[in-house]
């Protein structure tokens, strides 16, 4: 697999596309500290949207509010036609089945083999599958990330980059409609980071996902973004294409894209 050469697919003008996530005037504070201040954004069908910002800008809080790992203080979050804030526990569980979440840590179960890690969400979410169908889905997901040979390994036997790729395989094995990536390349060497970025693009192409990518890694931005939103101090600072960001004369933007 030559992962480093995979680019994000071309997306038509977003205004003509369906919104799969719509956020309006979102606020979230912890005590007196406002983390998100009137954040509004849209994720369109089939695109890779990168949310960029320095540490502490509210990026990870935003993504946790989307899947109700955190409750927002005010504003609205609409995901796949559902008002997230109004959903009861059963509704949230059903919505999360349609969303893949790649955690920064990878979050594999250390006591399970790679195969068992991938089987777990399938048995929980797609309960009518036969063992043969489960096996086929597991193999397909591992082939997509180039790690079929790790099928029977334990997480402790994997490198950091391999763990991240297995975590991605576990996320896509249930065929999510939306992918949420929380700092997917953090802690990885440049070569492995490029491979992960390329895999994000392959997931976009092969699984027809809409992806929201939280990062402060500029190379990840360059490799994956169809569109970029920059957060600064909990607010949307700029929205645009990679070209618009790289050509901006704004000093804060230039400090990221130097």
Where are these regions (language model features)?
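Conserved ABC ATPase signature
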Residues: 154-158, 162
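Helix-to-loop junction immediately C-terminal to a conserved catalytic motif
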Residues: 67
